From Swiss-Prot:
The lineage of its organism: Bacteria, Bacillati, Bacillota, Tissierellia, Tissierellales. One of its GO terms (biological process) is translation. GO terms for molecular function: structural constituent of ribosome. Belongs to the universal ribosomal protein uS2 family. Transmembrane segments: none annotated. PROSITE patterns: RIBOSOMAL_S2_1, RIBOSOMAL_S2_2. Residues 230-269 have a biased composition (Acidic residues). This is Small ribosomal subunit protein uS2. It comes from Finegoldia magna (strain ATCC 29328 / DSM 20472 / WAL 2508) (Peptostreptococcus magnus).
Amino acid sequence: MSVVSMKSLLEAGVHFGHQTRRWNPKMSKFIFTERNGIYIIDLQKTVKQIDDAYNYVRDIVADGGEVLFVGTKKQAQEAIETEAKRCGQHFVSQRWLGGMLTNYKTIKTRINRLHKLYEMEEDGTFDLLPKKEVSQLEREREKLEKNLGGIRKMNKMPSVLFVVDPKKEYIAVHEAKILGIPVVGIVDTNCDPDELDIAIPGNDDAIRAVKLLTSTIADAVIEANQGREDSEDVYSETENDTEETDEELVSEEDLKEFVENSEEESDEE
């Protein structure tokens, strides 16, 4: 049974791609049809790719690896931060600073500075300083926390990156490739799936879609770290407790009919 059902993907709007004039031909293998100028993603392909990504991330974490969740576009920020925290991993949700991976030694000095500022507040140092200086230090800490807070506890290179929209996060993907770090991520119809080790075709502009796919990857981390007494318990909340297969839930004919009858608008930017 798949880690996420096709029905859940449909309900979250994962199947809505970009406008047909904004597409990457390399995504053609993941496209089901076109509807009102919008590409419709083949969710049967999405199911397979998310299963592959889930197993891949789970196995990496089970071997002691760590995941860096990356998503700085508005639609992805909350899901990236929430799900990374839920599974105890690292994240970048505000801004990718050039060199976060390839110049980590320098980035690490800024992280150490952030830790130092927190220590100064906790040990009472702030109480001994003039208010103006404390205000300056607090502003410095807020800026560092915004950009580096999600990787404060990252003491080594991540074993894998999970990205939302590799076109947006091209610098992160490029740095990972330089260092030989595998990348898994959500690719919409305007992206190049060949940039990733495992590409999950899906809507990267709809908050619900991003949340569903990101939470599934977080579940893979949780399974690897904690194990599961009941395999159904750690799947996404939207996963139905059923013994029906995805094909029985939503067949290709059902999907086509859904697309033809759907009046839902795409979350296209």
